[in-house]
Structure formats: structure tokens, C-alpha cells
């Protein structure tokens, strides 16, 4: 039944922060299997199961992925997962049926369905890992060169690497902490979207001051940027503008 007194999962989720420094202690096969099985148990749209996970254990492959990512924790971790949007298995089914299905999985809707499925799988794994005492960090940096990652991992047509995740025991001197999130009132809208510009800007201004104080406190004043400044710096960049081309090369997003 419903237990309104149980806050365990809520508190676990609220404690999340990215861990970028791990002990030199690999995850056991049993732990890896449990994490993957937890991921598989996530909701999946129309039972399509459009995700695959690659567990990268070979140091040479890790090193090659680090070249793409530029981040040391692609190599220095307890385990490395790469999450793949995968319609390859569906293309195999497609060979024996009429009418063919590729119109669906080559479409924008197919991309959205697959990406959402993969994200749900990964978050189940993240929560299960943190419940076991491990830390995690997502690796969107693998999209710096999707073509190279597909080559390194020998991905077939209709299989597209979305991101990675490093998992491991946090190092003794790992000192990350949860970053303040946008206010509840700013992201939760009842019944209809609140697009009142004055209210939205007022909330953002207050949040910017909160984020700036967070950085000042953590760095003894070395950093003081606001969230808006970070967003503007990131989104004004011109990174990864070849993504549509890369999706097309994988057989996706053609319609």
C-alpha cells in the first residue's frame, strides 16, 4: 500500500551529485548485472525496448573514448557504460514483416521514443548505483565525435550512442555536492504553462543569486558566476552542429 512516511528514495534522489573522482576499484560482474537489470526494468514506450548498453572494460577502448571525451574519468572509474539508442534489433524484425516498419524508426518520433527510453534506463541505473553507495557521472562528451564513437564501439546501422556513464566508489577526497536546482515554483506549472515574463524573470534573478553564492561558498570566492551566465556561455557556443548529419548516417531522423 501507500506509505506516506517513507522518504528513502526521495532523500536518495535529492542527494545526487556528479562524482568525477573514483577509487581504483572495479565493479564486480554481479554488481554490473544488477545495475543493467535495474535499468531494463524502466518504463519503455509501447514495449519497444529501444535501448542497448555497452559495458566498456577494455582499457584500450576506454583510452580511445577518452580521446573523444577529453575527460580523465572516462578511463579512471569503476565501470564505464555507454547508452545506445538501438533500432538495429527492430530492423532485423523488419526484414520478415510487411508492411515494413522503417518509416517509424527512421522518423523524428522514433528518435524521441528511443532517446526517452534510453534516458529512463540510465536513470534507473544511476539511482540503483547510488543506492549501493557508488557515485556516477553522465558523459554527454562522447557526442563530441559520434562518428568516431560508433566506429570504436562497432555500432551497426540504427544504433546511436547518446551518452556514457562512469560509475565507481567515490574517492576519499571527492567533495562534490548537490547544486541548487531551479525553484519548484519555476518548473512546476499547474494546469497551464505560466509564461508571465515578469514573474519568470524575477524568479530567475533570485535563483541566479543563489547559484552565485553556492559557487562563492564552495570556492572561497574564486567563482561567482550565475546560472544565467553559465547557460548563455554554453548555449552560445557552436558545438556539435553536425548531429543531424550523424543521426542520418546511422539511419535515423530521415523523416
PLM features: residue spans?
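Acidic, surface-exposed loops and disordered segments
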Residues: 1-255
Amino acid at each position: 500500500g501507500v506509505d506516506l512516511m517513507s522518504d528513502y528514495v526521495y532523500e536518495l534522489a535529492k542527494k545526487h551529485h556528479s562524482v568525477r573522482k573514483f577509487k581504483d576499484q572495479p565493479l564486480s560482474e554481479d554488481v554490473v548485472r544488477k545495475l543493467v537489470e535495474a535499468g531494463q526494468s524502466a518504463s519503455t514506450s509501447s514495449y519497444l525496448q529501444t535501448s542497448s548498453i555497452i559495458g566498456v572494460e577494455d582499457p584500450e577502448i576506454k583510452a580511445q573514448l577518452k580521446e573523444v571525451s577529453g575527460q580523465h574519468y572516462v578511463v579512471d572509474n569503476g565501470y564505464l557504460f555507454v547508452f545506445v539508442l538501438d533500432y538495429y534489433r527492430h530492423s532485423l524484425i523488419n526484414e520478415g514483416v510487411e508492411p515494413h516498419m522503417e518509416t517509424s524508426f527512421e522518423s523524428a518520433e522514433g528518435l524521441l521514443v528511443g532517446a526517452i527510453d534510453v534516458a529512463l534506463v540510465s536513470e534507473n541505473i544511476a539511482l540503483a548505483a547510488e543506492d549501493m553507495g557508488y557515485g556516477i557521472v553522465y558523459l554527454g562528451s562522447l557526442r563530441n565525435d559520434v562518428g568516431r564513437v560508433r566506429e570504436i564501439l562497432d555500432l551497426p546501422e540504427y544504433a546511436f550512442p547518446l551518452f556514457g556513464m562512469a560509475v565507481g566508489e567515490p574517492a576519499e577526497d571527492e567533495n562534490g555536492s548537490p547544486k541548487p536546482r531551479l525553484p519548484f515554483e519555476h518548473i512546476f506549472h499547474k494546469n497551464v504553462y505560466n509564461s508571465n515574463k515578469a514573474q519568470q524573470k524575477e524568479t530567475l534573478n533570485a535563483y541566479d543569486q543563489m547559484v552565485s553564492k553556492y559557487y562563492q561558498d564552495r570556492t572561497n570566492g574564486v567563482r561567482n558566476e550565475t546560472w544565467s551566465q553559465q547557460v548563455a556561455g554554453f548555449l552560445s557556443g557552436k558545438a556539435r552542429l553536425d548531429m543531424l548529419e550523424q543521426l542520418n548516417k546511422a539511419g535515423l531522423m530521415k523523416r
